[in-house]
Amino acid sequence: MDKTLSREEAKQLMQLLCLDMSCWGNLPLMRRQYLVKCKEYHPDKGGNEESMKLLNSLYLKLQDSVSSVHDLNEEEDNIWQSSQVYCKDLCCNKFRLVGAIYGDYYEAYIMKQWDVCIHGYNHECQCIHCILSKYHKEKYKIYRKPPVWIECYCYKCYREWFFFPISMQTFFFWKVIIFNTEIRAVQPLLR
């Protein structure tokens, strides 16, 4: 998220969305609030035209920046080309949400065992948490710089970005964000 908007633009956007800066990076929440504020600021609905223009320009700039970060991540991962694979199932739509793909099984796959997975003791675990943690470590080894939230969707990056401790409450909010995130952003899950 540090590569998306300048600090001043981020503050402006969050003010227009009526969200606290601590929510910066919670893309599903920001999207939902953007849709609400579009209705409120729309000139045809009696809203402020200048606020609407500024909101649209900042939000579209954020979306473009996040997309370019996701595209960069896909290029860095370059393990296979999507043109080499054909899939017509719903799960293959990279714009679908993680929660929509996993459905009722999401809770079972997000983390197998709290005490084991949270500390990374089981290196063969295939829960979403452990897969994203392994992906984080791989990126760090390859690029010699720690990935940050939005470049990496692991629980560690989430906690470090928002300065949260390890707790069931922060884990709950992280898994809600992952549930509402496009599968293309959480790329390692497709492998």
Swiss-Prot record:
Post-translational modification N-acetylmethionine, affected residues: 1
Residues in H1C3-type zinc fingers: 136-157
Transmembrane stretches, start-end: none
Domain of life: Viruses
Residue span(s) of domain J: 12-80
Coiled-coil stretches noted in the UniProt entry, renumbered to this chain: none
Subcellular location(s) per record: Host cytoplasm; Host nucleus
Pfam families, per database record: Papo_T_antigen
GO CC annotations, alphabetized: host cell cytoplasm; host cell nucleus
Chain intervals annotated as zinc finger (C4-type): 117-130
Keywords tagged on the record: Acetylation, Activator, Early protein, Host cytoplasm, Host nucleus, Host-virus interaction, Metal-binding, Oncogene, Phosphoprotein, Transcription, Transcription regulation, Zinc, Zinc-finger
GO molecular function, one term: zinc ion binding
Subunit-structure text: Interacts with host PPP2R1A; the interaction inhibits PP2A activity.
Record function comment: Promotes efficient viral genome replication by accelerating both G1 and S phase progression of the cell cycle. Inhibits host PP2A by binding to the A subunit, thereby displacing lower affinity regulatory B subunit. Inactivation of PP2A in turn results in the transactivation of cyclin A and cyclin D1 promoters. Late during the infection cycle, ST may induce dephosphorylation of host MTOR, leading to the inhibition of cap-dependent translation. May establish and maintain high levels of viral genomes during persistent infection in cell culture.
Record remark on domains: The common region of ST and LT proteins comprises the J domain. This domain is essential for multiple viral activities, including virion assembly, viral DNA replication, transformation and transcriptional activation. This domain is also required for cyclin A-transactivating activity of ST.
Protein's name according to its UniProt entry: Small t antigen
Naturally occurring in which organism (per UniProt): KI polyomavirus (isolate Stockholm 60)
Lineage of producing organism: Viruses, Monodnaviria, Shotokuvirae, Cossaviricota, Papovaviricetes
